[in-house]
Amino acid sequence: MLKEPSVRLREAIIEGNLLIVKRLLRRNPDLLTNIDSENGWSSLHYASYHGRYLICVYLIQLGHDKHELIKTFKGNTCVHLALMKGHEQTLHLLLQQFPRFINHRGENGRAPIHIACMNDYYQCLSLLIGVGADLWVMDTNGDTPLHVCLEYGSISCMKMLLNEGEVSLDDNVRDKGNWKPIDVAQTFEVGNIYSKVLKEVKKKGPPLGAGKKPSSFRTPILNAKATFEDGPSPVLSMNSPYSLYSNNSPLPVLPRRISTHTTSGNGGNRRSSITNPVFNPRKPTLSTDSFSSSSNSSSRLRVNSINVKTPVGVSPKKELVSESVRHSATPTSPHNNIALINRYLLPNKSNDNVRGDSQTATINDDGGGGNGGDATIGMGLRKDPDDENENKYKIKVNNGEPRRRVSLLNIPISKLRNSNNTRAED
């Protein structure tokens, strides 16, 4: 048999099922508070006690406890119930929404700070101190939070209260039974720890800002301190929202000759520009293409500034051809043949018109007519017709003039007629 919506809503809050809670409250908006008849707990009380943070947010958005203060039958609020289990995140949310509950007294006249000291929840105590909780508030027996710490053996909360300075200024406060805090210590060990910590605190003196309470809902900002003492750190301590940069850093200074901006190179690659040239070897790749390159290539030949000497006894033509063949058949690497080719190809830096025509290593021979038997090499080499030795060539550089292409349109018509007549006679 299906249970009542109020019971299902209460069970969904305890289990932390936010979807069912939304569905039930959407269908039954009058069940927002849903007071339990056994203990007087509302929906927000159950969510706070079990630490259901998201459900607390949803209930507060719907207006839970907006117009009236809802207490349990024992007089506890949602802040008291959240502190009973030490739910720090839920406590922070409730203190933001209900700041009037900070010093509100519940069961046996205990304030939320008493509940934190009873269970030694020092994280929650630190949050209460930061928002301005009263450190001298008394319950129905006249016990202060320090009395409660020694009575229940909460060492961490006791040290935190003594280090606040305000409590250590007057440690002889008495309750209604005329008992001092040391008199209600749970064990002798707890009493000895209390005496030792109190002596150390009094020896150091009260800390800066002792006796002053925060005037608003803000965590007090302590002195900024870097996490790493040797130098600046991108990670700061929890209590230091701001940190100054330290000049005593052991890290080396970035060299000024290296610019950190990037420039786009050929082919879309991005590289950092460095003042001094640095050679980066490329991965060896076998080139199966000929020495001639396409005229549509975006890269241009540049003159190599390295002075290369031609070996004695070797003609420039043979050296050039052999080096070019070896360059095209072997893995590409920065060696002297590139400097030699650049030296013979482009001695003039301003010559930008020389493209694929000047890079072709083929010999164009006109065959003995027209040009007087001169054989022109595409790279600026001219063959001497008077010398039959192939090892002797004269180097002639094209000074910015593009090489003339050989075409049938360039041959005079008279030569064509003479050749036809000669064939007819034969």
Curated annotation (Swiss-Prot):
The target of rapamycin complex 2 (TORC2) is composed of at least AVO1, AVO2, BIT61, LST8, TOR2 and TSC11. TORC2 forms a homodimer. Contrary to TORC1, TORC2 does not bind to and is not sensitive to FKBP-rapamycin. AVO2 is peripherally associated to AVO1 and TSC11. This is Target of rapamycin complex 2 subunit AVO2. Residues 366-375 have a biased composition (Gly residues). GO terms for cellular component: cytoplasm; cytosol; nucleus; plasma membrane; TORC2 complex; vacuolar membrane. Component of TORC2, which regulates cell cycle-dependent polarization of the actin-cytoskeleton and cell wall integrity. TORC2 controls polarity of the actin cytoskeleton, which is required for orienting the secretory pathway toward discrete growth sites, via the RHO1/PKC1/MAPK cell integrity pathway. Keywords: ANK repeat, Cell membrane, Membrane, Phosphoprotein, Repeat, Vacuole. Present with 1180 molecules/cell in log phase SD medium. ANK repeats lie at residues 4-33, 39-68, 74-104, 108-137, 141-171. It holds the Pfam family Ank_2. The gene is AVO2. It is found in: Cell membrane; Vacuole membrane. InterPro entries: Ankyrin_rpt, Ankyrin_rpt-contain_sf. Coiled coil: none annotated. The keyword Iron-sulfur does not apply. The lineage of its organism: Eukaryota, Fungi, Dikarya, Ascomycota, Saccharomycotina. Residues 260-278, 350-359 have a biased composition (Polar residues).
